[in-house]
Each structure stands twice: as C-alpha cells, then as structure tokens.
Amino acid sequence: MRYSSGAVEALIEEFAKLPGIGRKTAQRLTMHVLHERRSEVEKLASALIDVKEKVIRCSVCQNITDLGVDPCHICTSAGRDRSVICVVESPTEVLAFEKTGHYKGLYHVLHGVISPLDGVGPDDIKVRELIARIGVDSTGGVREVVLALNPTVEGETTSLYISKLLKPLGINVTRIARGIPVGAELEFIDEATLSRAMEGRSAI
C-alpha cells in the first residue's frame, strides 16, 4: 500500500535507501518528520547539507575531518605514538577504538574492503594511500601496522593483501586478537573486548 502523497512516498523511498532502514522504519521516520515542527525539520535539512559540504577526508589517514582541519586532529596530535598505524575499514571503527581510551597510535581508514563479488578491488579502497604514506616516512618512524578489519571473508582477504604489500618494506604487520566473533562488526563491539583484542594482537 502506497500513500497518495507523492512527497510522502518520495521521502519514504529516500529514507529506505539508508543502511538498515526498511520501508516500515522509513514510514515511521517520514511520519515523524511530518509531525515535527518546521524549525526542527529545517535543522535536520541543514545538518544533512553541512555534512556533505563541510566534511572531508584527512589527506593523511583518510578519516573524516572538518573542512579546514587537514590533517585531522589525530594525525597532528603530539601525544600519539607515530610508530604504529591501525588500519580500519571505516571511520566508525576509529571512533570505537578511541572510545576505549587505550590505543594511542595513528590510524588509516580504507573506506571499504576487497570484495570481488561486489566488484570492489584493491584500487577501490585506500590501500595505495597507506603504502605511499609509509613510503614517504623518511624517518622510518612507522614500525608496526595493526590490521583491525572486521572478521569476515572480505576483511581477511584485505588483511592478507595488505600484509603481502607491507612485509617487503620491513614493517611489522600484526592483527587484533581473535576474541571477536566471526562476522561481527567492530563498531558494535564493547570497549573492553576491543581493548583486549588490541592488546592481544599477533603477527601475520
């Protein structure tokens, strides 16, 4: 059953395009927007536009940062251990590790994983930028790369690919411990488990 209003249906369809949002949830969100005050809806619309116009990727680590703050605050922080880079799939994993308060190294965000079935190859994610980043480190400061990708087939494939590229550079390549369930997404793992996984990392 579809609504007679074209505007309502259009908004439902747009909400339903979001990850994890089905039509029923999209309908509820649309009804909420309809019943909300205009000023609140305008705030939402403004926030959506701002996130596209004012958020960029850090030129060093590829994490998200505000326009005008590049490199990001993590890359420029004097308190970070610059000898270690933790490689993650998306910015949500950076936030997850930061919430633990234990990891003090740097990050590199791939923005995806290798997935041949989905047509995603190494050139479609930020692997090249990682290799170039380590290659231009003239001080030789990067000694370890921690692969913290989701425990999926795609994550494993990506980890092995990166490991093969880094080992000839003399980099110690490790992965977080296996205590995280296979198929789980790191952004939903609690802080204590993530901390133990990072502390228990092992060589590949």
UniProtKB/Swiss-Prot annotation:
SMART domains named in the record: TOPRIM
CDD domains: TOPRIM_recR
ZnF (C4-type) residues: 58-75
One GO-annotated biological process of the protein: DNA recombination
One of the Pfam families matching this protein, by short name: RecR_HhH
Annotated keywords: DNA damage, DNA recombination, DNA repair, Metal-binding, Zinc, Zinc-finger
Top-level lineage group: Bacteria
Gene Ontology terms, MF aspect: DNA binding; zinc ion binding
Residue ranges occupied by any Toprim domain in the UniProt entry: 83-181
Family: Belongs to the RecR family.
Cited HAMAP family: RecR
Protein name: Recombination protein RecR
Origin species: Chlorobaculum tepidum (strain ATCC 49652 / DSM 12025 / NBRC 103806 / TLS) (Chlorobium tepidum)
